[in-house]
Amino acid sequence: MSQTPPPKDGKNPEAMEVEDAIDEEILKMSTEDLKSRTHLLDNEIRIMRSEVQRINHSATTLKERIKENTERIKVNKTLPYLVSNVVELLDLEDNTEEEGANVDLDAQKTKCAVIKTSTRATYFLPVVGLVDPDELKPGDLVGVNKDSYLILEKLPAEYDSRVKAMEVDERPTEQYSDIGGCDKQIQELIEAVVLPMTHKDRFVNLGIHPPKGVLMYGPPGTGKTMMARAVAAQTKSTFLKLAGPQLVQMFIGDGAKLVRDAFALAKEKAPAIIFIDELDAIGTKRFDSEKAGDREVQRTMLELLNQLDGFQPNDDIKVIAATNRIDVLDPALLRSGRLDRKIELPHPNEDARARIMQIHSRKMNVNKDVNFEELARCTDDFNGAQCKAVCVEAGMIALRRDATEILHEDFMDAILEVQAKKKASLNYYA
């Protein structure tokens, strides 16, 4: 086996590498200097080890303290909260520093809060608590500790339970195709309510503001509520259904509070659609009256006017109102800027009546010889609801004679039944 020949100067290559790695200053030092230098380094290592041990001990102590505080916070948060409202948030300047002391400009101002509890007591909190003060604003509902009054949690906004019940959770199943003879009205409703929510960019490109609200008016049974239900079914927005008589309350200010809470809930869950049925219950023309009930109804309408065209309008909230008596509504409700678009739903014509009866009988076992055009000619002055009643009554007549399908004669008998219940032309206006 061949061996590597030693270098000419007689030095080992490994020793040469070690010498190259050592600083020249150390190579020039004497043995005594090297010993003292090594002793100093040993002392520094000993000091650093003790410092590491001290830091580890401090970290362990802090972890235990954090664990204790976390358990204490958990215990405090499981206690029943005292419900309070934030009245005001203050920037408190700390001027207690001694003259000439170093001042931290970032920590010079601290956020403080003034709260009012459900016991009608008002407290000033120099320390807010567990909630970031930047997340709070006056009027927020918070849960505080009943002993220290520190804010433990921000609670959801409080709404009237009657307003929460107005939100439609289960979507209606109606579609635009279920409404016959109202193609123009459906198009106007889609343009005013649905398009601003689904295609907002088209309005921005044209530089126009969509209508804030829609008023549907016409005789009873012409499909006003059904159109609103179709809009609720076709849009993914929050849908609130209010009835005018619901807003007429016994106590002063109760109806106005319902209107305020309804719009506040719609603003929180925007985009939202508010449907007010039977608007004439609260929207009648204002007049001088000494009765407290009349004045309360007028106050409710004034709150509705304020929400429709208030100081802070919201384009993500659309209002659909329906009424049979547009002639008694207050002019302030009808002016532009509030209920901008008025959609009239008149009695259906002959073609519309035929279409309505075809829609309501499409799932029924109807004989192919049924002539809906002839039925439409026989149902003069019928509204949409009465046309639907004809289909239902025809099915009941066929059921009465144990038939498997509905004949044309059943529809004719049903028309006579509905006309007999009608007896005379009804007058819906006083």
UniProtKB/Swiss-Prot annotation:
- InterPro entries linked: 26S_Proteasome_ATPase (IPR050221), AAA+_ATPase (IPR003593), AAA_lid_3 (IPR041569), ATPase_AAA_core (IPR003959), ATPase_AAA_CS (IPR003960), NA-bd_OB-fold (IPR012340), P-loop_NTPase (IPR027417), Prot_ATP_ID_OB_2nd (IPR032501)
Q: What is its main location?
A: cytoplasm
User: Per its UniProt record, what Pfam families does this chain match?
Assistant: AAA, AAA_lid_3, Prot_ATP_ID_OB_C
Q: Which UniProt keywords apply?
A: ATP-binding, Cytoplasm, Nucleotide-binding, Nucleus, Proteasome
Claim: Nucleotide-binding is one of the keywords in the record: yes
Return the Gene3D superfamilies for the record. Answer: 1.10.8.60, Nucleic acid-binding proteins (2.40.50.140), P-loop containing nucleotide triphosphate hydrolases (3.40.50.300)
Effect of gene knockout: RNAi-mediated knockdown results in larval arrest and up-regulation of the aspartic protease ddi-1, indicative of proteasomal dysfunction. RNAi-mediated knockdown in a ddi-1, png-1, sel-11 or sel-1 mutant background results in reduced or failed expression of the proteasomal subunit rpt-3.
- Cellular compartments per GO CC: cytoplasm; nucleus; proteasome regulatory particle, base subcomplex
Which function does this protein serve? Component of the 26S proteasome, a multiprotein complex involved in the ATP-dependent degradation of ubiquitinated proteins. This complex plays a key role in the maintenance of protein homeostasis by removing misfolded or damaged proteins, which could impair cellular functions, and by removing proteins whose functions are no longer required. Therefore, the proteasome participates in numerous cellular processes, including cell cycle progression, apoptosis, or DNA damage repair.
Protein name (database record): 26S protease regulatory subunit 6A
**Organism expressing this protein natively:** Caenorhabditis elegans
The record's gene field reads rpt-5
